[in-house]
Amino acid sequence: LGGNLRAAKQTLLREVALTDPGKVFGPFGVGGPESFCVVCHSEPHQPQGLKDRGLSRPVAAAAEEAERKCSLCESFEELSRRIARAEYLVLRRVEPRTHGELKWHSVLTALGVELWIEDEDELLAHHRDGDWVLRVNAPRLDPVKADGRTVPVVAFRFLPNFTPFQGDGAIREMADLAQASEGAPYFGALRMDVDNLGRLFSEGLGGRLSLSRLATLSRSLSTFFEGYLNRICEELDRHRAHLYLLYSGGDDLLAVGSWDKVVSLGERVREEFRRYTCHNPALTVSGGTSLHHEKFPLYQAAEVAGDLLETAKAWKRDGKTKDAFNLWGQPLDWDTLAWAHGWHDRITTWLDHDKVRRAFVFKLARIASMHDEVQKELSRRRDLTEDQVRRRVRHERWLWTLVYYLAKENAELQEDLHRLQQELVGEDRVQ
């Protein structure tokens, strides 16, 4: 069947190409050096057919290249600003129509629905009888009352919209988030999702499977990712200066922000998810975070973080996969991540109080590199088993180099440094 369908599609395309080559091979649009949108690269009034539906897609003329955007992309920017401050969602049935400039709500209007994202003042000004009003991120159904008016609320909706703001109320740029990071001015991207979700739905309920239980399971996961992520972000970033929750729903999330806060967010999400699921060992999450310069394209950062997430899910240790976190390309189990974060905080305190120099950090990085090099070299040998490689790596040059460097550091810190050495070597945490 699939082969027949592909053949039919190819035959149709061939016939069109023979009868009207322009529809297949173009040219499309009008070209020109400065008439396209800098965001989506669309030319004015493209794709073809918009005019036939009463729609236009102008590209704003602007002296600054960054401001040259089409009506759709500009409307998405306005949508993001409204979502960040949303208090109510208003749904209104209208006659299906298409007219004016192409914007984010044009598709909804074509389907006979208008959606408004408003605060309380706008709601009171625009509300009409018959509108459906949903309260955002506040599970209450009491009506809105002000100025002698009463607006009924029919439902509530969780909306993961945690957004960082500047002092003037504008949404912070990626450069601001990067500069607000601890240490190096980079931003981080974080992707996370629930492990084995398909298996969870197909096998997790066993003989107790029913439509209502399946729906409850789905709603419970959505409630965590859509309703609770805002709370987690607020606790980590009370001044809304570091984290931007771009998406969270169903069983996964995407967030960006100051790199140190992004790592903390990943740890906190995993911790709270375990509490939410009563520490059920069958319900786990994996994550991946990437590190980028402030000019790095956001969509590419999301892709890189997604690739790191997949690597974390595929990472094997002790015969199991998933339930892991990929920190800038290095897969770790969650316990090791917490251990590393604890030592990061301690070493940062030493640096702040001049108890060690920055060279100390570079020495540790060099030792880790030595460990990786010898591990890769031994792993290429076919005469050694995986267990033999692991045992030999633990007695190579990096070990006595570590002991030597730590012994030369501040005498006041020797007790802590000895513990660090024991944990690195005894628990095989040099990565």
PLM regions and their residue ranges:
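Charged, helix-rich terminal subdomains or tails
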Residues: L1-Q431
